[in-house]
Amino acid sequence: MKNVTDSFVSLGHWPSAGSFGFNTDIFATNPINLSVVLGVLIFFGKGVLSDLLDNRKQRILSTIRNSEELRGGAIEQLEKARARLRKVEIEADEFRVNGYSEIEREKSNLINAAYENLERLENYKNESIHFEQQRAMNQVRQRVFQQALQGALETLNSYLNSELHLRTISANIGMLGTMKNITD
């Protein structure tokens, strides 16, 4: 047994270079130092760390709230834009329908105006033709009358001699004189 106790005692006195043994110096041992450092860090750093985490949590919650508000505003704006789009689409449909009916009305007005113009032109043409026919008939009548008068004058001149001519003039002068006396 003595050997066993000697071996434990000798373990405590081994040189530290390259050997294994227990270090009885509490401040020189690593696990104790680490536990002390960790304990101090936990004790003093707990408040700082919780403050940092609380600040971070508040910033995250604030960012989430802001994002939710922005999302709500965006949804509201989207609904307004959709309502405006529906309104504009309805107005566009009304304009399209009204535009088509206006186009059809203008088309029928133009067609009616064209028919009226054609009718007027047709009437003018007919009047012009009628006028030209009347003028041609008047010219033919004048020509026939002139030729008949010319023929009558030639016939009269061939039958008249100077004595008959003088008697006709005297008779006409007498008739004019009688007419003058009656009118006075």
Curated annotation (Swiss-Prot):
MF (Gene Ontology): proton-transporting ATP synthase activity, rotational mechanism
Chief localization: plastid
CDD domains on file: ATP-synt_Fo_b
Membrane topology: Single-pass membrane protein
Record-linked Pfam families: ATP-synt_B (PF00430)
Keywords: ATP synthesis, CF(0), Chloroplast, Hydrogen ion transport, Ion transport, Membrane, Plastid, Thylakoid, Transmembrane, Transmembrane helix, Transport
InterPro entries xrefs: ATP_synth_b/b'su_bac/chlpt
Keyword Coiled coil: no
UniProt-annotated location(s): Plastid, Chloroplast thylakoid membrane
Spans through the membrane: 27-49
Miscellaneous information on this protein: In plastids the F-type ATPase is also known as CF(1)CF(0).
Family: Belongs to the ATPase B chain family.
HAMAP family: ATP_synth_b_bprime
Function: F(1)F(0) ATP synthase produces ATP from ADP in the presence of a proton or sodium gradient. F-type ATPases consist of two structural domains, F(1) containing the extramembraneous catalytic core and F(0) containing the membrane proton channel, linked together by a central stalk and a peripheral stalk. During catalysis, ATP synthesis in the catalytic domain of F(1) is coupled via a rotary mechanism of the central stalk subunits to proton translocation.
Self-association and partners: F-type ATPases have 2 components, F(1) - the catalytic core - and F(0) - the membrane proton channel. F(1) has five subunits: alpha(3), beta(3), gamma(1), delta(1), epsilon(1). F(0) has four main subunits: a(1), b(1), b'(1) and c(10-14). The alpha and beta chains form an alternating ring which encloses part of the gamma chain. F(1) is attached to F(0) by a central stalk formed by the gamma and epsilon chains, while a peripheral stalk is formed by the delta, b and b' chains.
Protein name: ATP synthase subunit b, chloroplastic
Annotated organism of origin: Amborella trichopoda
